């Protein structure tokens, strides 16, 4: 199976995502500089939220690669977990804009993937649509740059992977390729590089 030939490489990427659990602390301090007990508690909620996302990132990547499925029993609870942890952090710091961005990110990502599924049912699975909403919560919480870059990066990674398979004659245009791992890799790209890339792009536009 063409996808299996590249599974080892993709699984290494997914395993590397688990290292984001350790990096979640640094991410939290980048979002919230703790100075009060409430801010320390908020930082702990952010760390927990992104550590949880790191764990399910690996689990979902492995499952999708092997079965072409993103199980509801893992994806759907992530809405509640991510929502509760990140909302708690935002409430403690009174960062209402983060709450708005997370909500907009969830709706926008879900709606975008839902439309893609309607337009081309065979190209996007229902699990991808549900996962998109979860990813939107995390990326939106961080910022608009993270949301834009994370959403776009998934299609870049998936497209490059698909082209590479076709050029190596391991796949055809009709070959089913799991998209979940690329959504997840794109999400983590948005998490750690989205704001910087977004700022760089705005500076570039301003200089044109």
Residue ranges and their predicted role:
Residues 1-40, 200-208:
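Short, strongly hydrophobic alpha-helical membrane anchors
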Residues 12, 22-92:
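Intramembrane alpha-helical segments
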Residues 58, 83-84, 116, 164, ...:
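Hydrophobic residues within the alpha-helical transmembrane core of Major Facilitator Superfamily
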Residues 60-63, 67-159, 199-208:
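Functional transmembrane core segments of multi-pass inner-membrane proteins
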Residues 156-168:
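Transmembrane alpha-helical segments of integral membrane proteins
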Residues 166-189, 201:
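Interfacial loop-to-transmembrane junctions
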Residues 193-196:
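Transmembrane helix exit motif
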